[in-house]
Amino acid sequence: MKKFRARYAPSPTGHLHIGNARTALFNYLFARHHGGDFIIRIEDTDVARNVEGGITSQLNNLKWLGMDWDEGVDVGGSFGPYNQLSRLELYKKYAFELLEKGYAYKDFKEGSEDFAIRFKVPENVLYEFDDVIRGTLKFESKDVEDWIILKDNGIPTYNFAVVIDDHYMEITHVFRGEEHITNTPKQLMVYDALGWEYPTFGHMTIIVNEDRKKLSKRDTNTIQFIEDYKNLGFLPEAMLNFLSLLGWSPKDDEEILSKEELISLFDEHRLSAAPSYFDKQKLAYINSRYLKALSMDELKDLTRPFLINHGIEIKNEAWLESLLSILKDRLSYGAEITKYYDQFFHHDFVLEPAVLEEIKEFDNEVVIKGFMGAISSVDFTDDVAINQALKDTGKALNIKGKPLFMPIRIATTGEAHGPSLPVSLSLLGKELVIKRMNKTLEVLKGETK
């Protein structure tokens, strides 16, 4: 059986966009699942729109996501060169072959000997192909006008060059966005004129935003580029996992899947034609699942730069570990550590009525004042000493369990539930703990008036 070969063919006109990353991923998963080759080809003929560093950025972000490729502009291969500007003579050869065979004609510039080569669309021809995702698609030639295949400057147009490249690189399968469906008739015309076999096409669904409109680069409510997610502290494994679910689904309901599992499970026939919703909450959830699986050292390495850039002094490794032990379960991505740090330490301490309702039956004032007395000489860098102060308070007041711990937790953190109370108090520091308990006493006093 012929070896499957799939490709991702970006233009160097910008950084790696969500939609392009998904296109690359589905071609990658297809090739790896079937034991085929994954190729990256650069379509760089639109020189005016090419961005310096655009390709390097795209390739780096694909690698960050965990993808690798068998052939490409950076790794070489037997079917190169892998950028179009290095293949101009090949396009010219076939453009003139079509010209000589009568499938194309010269289109002269007015008042000049310069000419483009325009493809002559045949009359009354029905073009059809079987799309892996959408079934049989048909087009009539009467709906397509004659079109340029080679500009007067020797640069090929997209719909011509892509056929030459896919044929010469022996591409067997092309998975791309549905916006390319309308390009397909022109490409089929070139395949037929040159007597070449079509690759198998699959046109993927559009990605839509929360308004169910097509996600575009102008949509400011959704982060569009992989680089931005990387800079926010999203994990590459989570991003890869999330992207795989934008238009594809496994047979069962399990959605947390490693790259190896995705390769094993991938089935191109489960790609959907229905619009795929870019669910930001789902992305946050998936990333949080991967964050929870990190070791403490990995979590420290992820969050440390965000804390430092936020101007937060990391006192020592033990302090950072204590902070993360309290905040890690709240994190959806790395940069969020600064938001929760600020909420924990610096926000205006507010006691919500619903929280106070949970302790209305307890002897709150007595417990809080008793604990304030017990910590007067306690070293707040010592969790064990703080825990002992809690025990001493309970023993002195003959109170234990919720009636002891909940008033102190609410008085110091503003929350009824949370992680280890001694660790939380140690992080807050004695000065802030006493300040908050005094404020709580004032609030409680006001409620009893």
Curated annotation (Swiss-Prot):
The gene is gltX. Coiled coil: none annotated. Signal peptide: none annotated. Monomer. One of its GO terms (biological process) is glutamyl-tRNA aminoacylation. The keyword DNA repair does not apply. It comes from the Bacteria. The keyword Lipoprotein does not apply. It catalyses: tRNA(Glu) + L-glutamate + ATP = L-glutamyl-tRNA(Glu) + AMP + diphosphate. ATP binds at residue 217. PANTHER family: GLUTAMATE--TRNA LIGASE, GLUTAMATE--TRNA LIGASE, MITOCHONDRIAL-RELATED. One of its GO terms (molecular function) is ATP binding. Its EC number is 6.1.1.17. Catalyzes the attachment of glutamate to tRNA(Glu) in a two-step reaction: glutamate is first activated by ATP to form Glu-AMP and then transferred to the acceptor end of tRNA(Glu). It holds the Pfam family Anticodon_2. Belongs to the class-I aminoacyl-tRNA synthetase family. Glutamate--tRNA ligase type 1 subfamily. GO terms for cellular component: cytosol. A motif ('HIGH' region) lies at residues 10-20. It comes from Acholeplasma laidlawii (strain PG-8A). The lineage of its organism: Bacteria, Bacillati, Mycoplasmatota, Mollicutes, Acholeplasmatales. It is found in: Cytoplasm. This is Glutamate--tRNA ligase.
